[in-house]
């Protein structure tokens, strides 16, 4: 979980900017999008193999 403490004499905008940067770096939004809908294990395996095939032939 990303956590940002607002420093003395720091504007809320800059603290929010730091928080957003930390979330992006941690991959929070990507994880949320990935888990938005349930994927069965067979679908996950299929996507993983297709991605590997794409990387190999690119």
UniProtKB/Swiss-Prot annotation:
Per its UniProt entry, which superkingdom is the organism in? Bacteria
Q: Which GO terms describe its biological process?
A: translation
Region Disordered: start-end pairs: 35-58
Q: Which Pfam families is this protein grouped with?
A: Ribosomal_S21
Q: Where is the composition biased (Basic residues)?
A: 43-58
Q: Which Gene3D superfamilies match?
A: Ribosomal protein S8
Q: Does the keyword rRNA processing apply?
A: no
Enumerate the InterPro entries for this protein: Ribosomal_bS21 (IPR001911), Ribosomal_bS21_CS (IPR018278), Ribosomal_bS21_sf (IPR038380)
Q: Which UniProt keywords apply?
A: Ribonucleoprotein, Ribosomal protein
Identify one Gene Ontology CC term for this UniProt entry.
ribosome
Q: Which GO terms describe its molecular function?
A: structural constituent of ribosome
NCBIfam families with a match to the protein in the record: S21p
Q: Member of which family?
A: Belongs to the bacterial ribosomal protein bS21 family.
This chain's protein is named: Small ribosomal subunit protein bS21
Identify the coding gene.
Answer: rpsU
């Amino acid at each position: 979980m990303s956590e940002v403490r607002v420093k003395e004499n720091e504007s809320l905008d800059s603290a929010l900017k730091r928080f957003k940067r930390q979330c992006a770096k941690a991959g929070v939004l990507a994880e949320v999008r990935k888990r938005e809908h349930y994927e069965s294990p067979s679908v996950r395996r299929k996507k993983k193999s297709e991605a590997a095939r794409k990387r190999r032939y690119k």
